[in-house]
Structures are given as structure tokens and as C-alpha cells.
Amino acid sequence: NAVFDFCLKNKIKLIYSATSASLGNKGKDKNLSPYAFTKSKNLEFLENLRKWFNFKYEVIYFYNVYGPNQICTGKMATVIGIFEDHYLKKKPLPVVRPGSQSRRFTHIDDTIEVCFKAWKQNKNRHLSVTNKKSFSILEVAKLFNSKIKFLPQRKGERFASALTKINNSNKIYKHYGKINLNNYVKNFLQKHSKIN
């Protein structure tokens, strides 16, 4: 709430990072995790700020962003970052069971392009930046031509990537990334096969 208050007092437009996790399963997935629940409630609060105070914002839904300088270890690590880290350390790639969970992956360059677009406009819009193709986590792991280690299934795990359509009374404007995950991984493997 401190960020909302600061923007409101200083008449600053907020670019808010939303999550598609809160929209999955026709909105029922918002209670799957504290993260999805909090993001969902913040969107409701933003809508009210707009109605009450003419608050300016743009909301962007991100889908598994990957690319240079991504986080590769720890709780905030990206799927692609974890796989790259394990590949470089010659460790089996960890895949949470069953592995058929599907996700959409978006390169950071495509993401930045949409963020810049949102910053320039002044329309109180909801935008999503994603890729048209989704992959199962197991499919992604197999792109690395590496050994795979299955981990136990996690509570609150989503099985499909929710493509955003409508949030509250807002249309979501879709932007599709141009950079292909297969090519990205292929380039990563070529680059590091020369080093190893």
C-alpha cells in the first residue's frame, strides 16, 4: 500500500506487475497461493483507486520471463534460469512431478518492449506479454539434452498457463513475443558447448 499511497500523493502513474496465476481456472486459482491472492486483491484495490481518485496506472501480466541476467538460484529463480544453472554445473535438471504442467515463456526483450509501451500510454489498460506457444516443464527440460531429476509434486501448483482475457471489467490487450524459446535454448547450448 505504501507504493500506491506514494504514487497517489505525488500524481505518479503506476506500472503494476500483475500475475496470470490469479486469473487461471476462471479466477478460481487466485486462492491457490498467497502470491496469487495478494496480486488479485491489489488489482481490485487499483480499480477502486481509479474510481475514487482518478488514479493513473497500467497493469502488465507477465509470463515466465527469461533471458540474460535472470535469477538462476534461490526461491525467486526462473525455470529457465534453474535449468541453465544445473546444465552448467552438470547436475540433473529438477522437474516437479508430473512435469506436464504447461507454461508460456517470454523473453526479457519482448517484455521490455511492452513495458515501454505501457509507460508511454495513458489509458489505464491491462496488457499481457506472452508467447503464443506453451510448453510443458518436461518439454523445456528436454530442450537442454540433459539428465532430469523428478521432484515431488508441490501444493498449489498450477497445471496450465492461464491466458488472460478479462480481469474485473477490463479487457486485456495481448502482446505476443517474437523471440522463440527453442532458439534461445539452442543458442545457449551452442555457446556453452564451446566453453565446456
Features from the language model and the residues they span:
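Glycine-rich "substrate-gating" loop/helix at the edge of Rossmann-like oxidoreductase active sites
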Residues: 32-35, 63-77, 97-108
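Conserved Rossmann-fold NAD(P)-dependent oxidoreductase catalytic core, especially the SDR/UDP-sugar
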Residues: 1-34, 58
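Active-site Tyr-X1-5-Lys
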Residues: 5-8, 32-63, 84-89
